[in-house]
Swiss-Prot record:
Gene3D superfamilies: 1.20.5.340. Non-essential, abundant cell division factor that is required for proper Z-ring formation. It is recruited early to the divisome by direct interaction with FtsZ, stimulating Z-ring assembly and thereby promoting cell division earlier in the cell cycle. Its recruitment to the Z-ring requires functional FtsA or ZipA. InterPro entries: Cell_div_ZapB. GO terms for biological process: division septum assembly; FtsZ-dependent cytokinesis. Residues 3-59 form a coiled coil. GO terms for cellular component: cytoplasm. It comes from Shewanella denitrificans (strain OS217 / ATCC BAA-1090 / DSM 15013). This is Cell division protein ZapB.
């Protein structure tokens, strides 16, 4: 291989490595977002269950008064 080809190869390898590092950082950000969304989803599910229990309790009171 000529020196020029080796230089081009080195440039392409360096660019690829930089791209891989950027993708790793993006992946880490997406993992963090996913974790945050999972936590938010769990909180919303708990809120929904709480409200559902309250509504069912009120419906039960209404039914017992009828």
């Amino acid at each position: 291989m000529s020196l020029e080809l080796l230089s081009q190869l080195e440039t392409k390898i360096q660019a690829t490595l930089e791209n891989i590092e950027l993708l790793k950082m993006e992946l880490e950000e997406e993992k963090q977002k996913s974790t945050q969304l999972a936590e938010k989803n769990q909180k919303l599910q708990q809120d929904l269950n709480s409200w559902s229990d309250k509504v069912n309790g009120l419906v039960g009171l209404l039914n017992s008064e009828i």
